[in-house]
Amino acid sequence: WEPAHQLIQLIDPIAQLRVWAKKIVHLHGKDTSVDWDAVSHHGIFAAKDFAPERTPGFGDTNWRDVFSILHENGYEGDVCIEGYHYPVYAGEWEMTSQMHALKYLKFCRGGDFVPNPWDVK
């Protein structure tokens, strides 16, 4: 599952995730930004791309909500960052974009993992 596909179809990814969360087994870290001016003037079939793909941190998805919903529903999998989609950070800047996405996604899920010293099993 990834939110970019829902946004490109003008589907609210958070509303969909709330319904599907228990069925998610893999998560892609890919995003998009919907250009609502283009949609309002030309519709979704305009010559201009109304929803260019982005790496997380540069798009419209609320990744804090994504992680919260998945956590509340028992998701323990990883997030695979999909690169090579954001033209602003293409070529020599690709790894910069992907590292930013990694740091951003870690922040959205609550930061680096710190074990609870009082959680004795």
Residue ranges of model-derived segments:
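Histidine-acidic metal/acid-base catalytic patches
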Residues: W1-K121
